[in-house]
Swiss-Prot record:
Residues 1-21 have a biased composition (Basic residues). Belongs to the universal ribosomal protein uL16 family. One of its GO terms (molecular function) is rRNA binding. This is Large ribosomal subunit protein uL16. NCBIfam families: rplP_bact. Keywords: Ribonucleoprotein, Ribosomal protein, RNA-binding, rRNA-binding, tRNA-binding. PROSITE patterns: RIBOSOMAL_L16_1, RIBOSOMAL_L16_2. One of its GO terms (cellular component) is cytosolic large ribosomal subunit. Disulfide bonds: none annotated. The lineage of its organism: Bacteria, Pseudomonadati, Campylobacterota, Epsilonproteobacteria, Campylobacterales.
Length: 141
């Protein structure tokens, strides 16, 4: 599972997930990728599940780049615990996703196979996405 090696503080406040993505919103490594079209939050398990689905479909051919990293701790209190007594312990690591963010990129395989693999990955993600290529990338969200 993806998570930071160390952080300055163990726990963070929730914050707000607003606006559009101004960084990481264009294909940088591959020829085809997945772009988020709405706000959401992705955790390390979802990133890994989508990666495994893509890798199995392309039978380890080509190359996959993961363009997101979960660096925000999400806390949870144990089940059947009364409120109070402080903030819960870190449960999982997440990343806030804004519209326009590239999540995965692929290269080195034919486009039809890549589209099938990316469609499998799209079903594992908790927000709406679209498949973009280097030609279709300049379209509005």
């Amino acid at each position: 599972m993806l998570m930071p090696k160390r952080t300055k503080f163990r726990k963070q406040m929730k914050g707000r997930n607003r606006g559009k993505s101004f960084r990481g919103n264009s294909l940088a490594f591959g020829d085809i990728g997945i772009k988020a079209t709405e706000h959401g939050r992705i955790d390390s398990r979802q990133i890994e599940a989508a990666r495994i689905a893509m890798t199995r479909h392309i039978k380890r051919a080509g190359k996959i780049w993961i363009r997101v990293f979960p660096d925000k701790p999400l806390t949870a209190k144990p089940l059947e615990t009364r409120m109070g007594k402080g903030k819960g312990s870190v449960d999982k690591w997440v990343m806030n996703i804004q519209p326009g963010r590239i999540v995965y990129e692929m290269a080195g395989i034919e486009e039809e196979l890549a589209r099938e693999a990316l469609a499998l990955a799209q079903s594992k993600l908790p927000f709406k996405t679209k498949i973009v290529t280097s030609e279709s990338e300049n379209e509005i969200y």
